């Protein structure tokens, strides 16, 4: 019987070249028809890695496959449950390449494209069946099953793998790698606060608890901003029609590739902003004695919440009306720096506004505000055509010339001007430190990333030539700007977090903490 069933299964597989594969993550189901080739009992196929099915397979390898021979749809066929994995071994990739070409040459151009291969845009996948159901409505026994236990991952191992991937999904949803945009202003606000405490002779009043609460609250605010941006860019179709998305533009794509529902993303935003509000009110109570005390903490919290949800959220939609860049600069510049500074210098001012050294914190926030805005600015270059199509009037869209093709010379010129102004502001803080109490000479160390700035400018100019070339591949050129996107993030991170003033302050604080610990241990 087993041999007879094996022959029936092989006959179906040999007489078909396409299969329908169903994938699912968190209740989001997808289906796609793909060409396949046999490799023993395994099924091998080629696809693009950013597609919905490939993204869902990466998170949940369990798939369902339906195969019907040509002309026998619905009469004789196979229904297969299995586990699907992306092929990573180079020898296996070569084998998969040959197998797929034996079935179809329709995708050969993409399979051999060096750019797509280098950037991991295309890939080969293997389905390992765990259960094969043979269906034939003309036979007396219409359904017959074959199980392949060796292909099935143990329940415990699968649960562990899915758990890790679920964590990865949440990190992707909140765009965790971009939380450096929050770390930099909080670190700067903390560095200025530590300096003020030290100058007032009360450095021992530094509170790590308050520092971590500030950092956590600010990080949740950014998560809320990112998630709400994903949700509202989905409802406006901005991310749906964006065909050149990357890790730096086009959102997290968790909605578009079926990893999370729009409702789940919106809930993520609302829960995150609720966490921010809760932490903010607690900090306000600690500083003022009242959860709703009239303090800068309360007002920066209100403004920050408005900017986070109103960046792309209805009905405000700041990002669609040309105010998004300003919102980003304010939210991740003065609001975070000054908010952190106010909380951490509470032992000095005791909630008396006139005793708060806000000017120094404001000045320190200027360079980082410009630089974080430039991260968004350069990331909007790839998004410009799709943003313009849905009426998202960012300043890149507003300043570009659209004559059938989006000309980005003016936005690039402004990018460079703002970058120069950011480092002039850094130098100004250093000069102020030489003659006043409103700066620090250690700020000069933050000029070191200028070398990276020069490199970013050079790469951007080279990219602009390609972008304006009418013969250029419009699907590939946007991805060639990624090095400039990465460089801009690096410039912001290095300038904010490797400012010697910050390192010096934190080092002194760490030394003091270490000394206290040593004294305690020595009795």
Roles of regions detected by a PLM:
Residues 2-4, 76-159:
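Charged, gly/pro-rich active-site loop segments
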Residues 16-49, 55-57, 63-69, 76-80:
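Short beta-strand segments
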Residues 159-213, 217, 221, 225, ...:
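Topogenic membrane-insertion module of multi-pass membrane proteins
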Residues 243-289, 392-439, 479-489:
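Multi-pass membrane catalytic core of lipid/isoprenoid biosynthesis enzymes
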Residues 220-246, 373-396:
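Acidic (Asp/Glu-rich) catalytic motifs at the cytosolic membrane interface
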Residues 435-523:
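Extended hydrophobic alpha-helices typical of membrane-associated regions
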Residues 251-350:
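Intramembrane alpha-helical segments
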Residues 186, 200-228, 296-309, 354-378:
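Membrane-embedded alpha-helical segments that form the functional core of polytopic membrane enzymes
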